Amino acid sequence: YHDAVNGAGMGVHGSITYDIGEMFAFKRSVSEKLRSGIHALLKGAKVDVIEGTAQIAAPGAVDVTGADGAVTRYTAAYILAATGSVNVRPPIPGLELPGVMTSDELLEGADTPYQSIVIIGGGVIGVEFAAFFSQLGCRVTLVEGMANLLPQLDRELGQNLAQILKKQGVEVLTSAMVQSVEQTAGGLCVRLEQKGKELAVTGERVLCAIGRRAYFDGLFAAD
């Protein structure tokens, strides 16, 4: 889309639009095909797939509650917990406001394009969404508390990526700590502190992409 819109210099002319709702619908259809393919691979490998909510009840024992509420116990010499992860929402005032989303919520899809978005967190998820939305013509502000983007990786990589994003029109703010998010008449206002100075950036939406944690909620029996 970005190349087509900006293709006049290469002799590409014409009017082009996008439907973000259809884009997310396509994303969901691809994900569903991948899930179906994985199920087929597991079936071919003679792996029993049991649907339900699991809880480790005792060493070597897992209770699974099915959709009908019935509980079935399964036993094994070893148990591997591969329950995935969930988004982290730190205790920052305003992160509970409407329009503040996690990456999971954002991936559920949007009906209308966003004109502007503030992304809190310059890790892998935040950088990916910054690149995605900037290519769609959205005004993007990317906020990272550490000195560089992708702080878990080599410093040079984060610095180079910041330059690439800036060339795409992304406003990159590093060493910037979010103090609060407020609802205003023009959208959402994110108040920051950067090297002793107070800043404020605004957006139609705010994406909280600070990180994820392992999901173990309810996995272990209380006793």
Spans of features found by a protein language model:
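Glycine-rich flavin
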Residues: 1-114, 141, 146-150, 156-157, ...
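Flavin (primarily FAD) cofactor-binding/catalytic cores of flavoenzymes
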Residues: 54, 176-179, 193-198, 219
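Core beta-strand elements of the Rossmann-like FAD/NAD(P) dinucleotide-binding domain
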Residues: 69-78, 196-205, 216
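Flavin (primarily FAD) binding-site architecture
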Residues: 82-95, 209-223
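Residues at the starts of beta-strands that form the adenosine-phosphate
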Residues: 116, 138-141, 171
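Glycine-rich Rossmann-fold phosphate-binding loop(s) that bind the pyrophosphate
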Residues: 120-123
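N-terminal Rossmann-fold NAD(P) dinucleotide-binding loop
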Residues: 126-127
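Gly/Ala-rich phosphate-binding loop of Rossmann-like dinucleotide-binding domains
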Residues: 130, 134-135
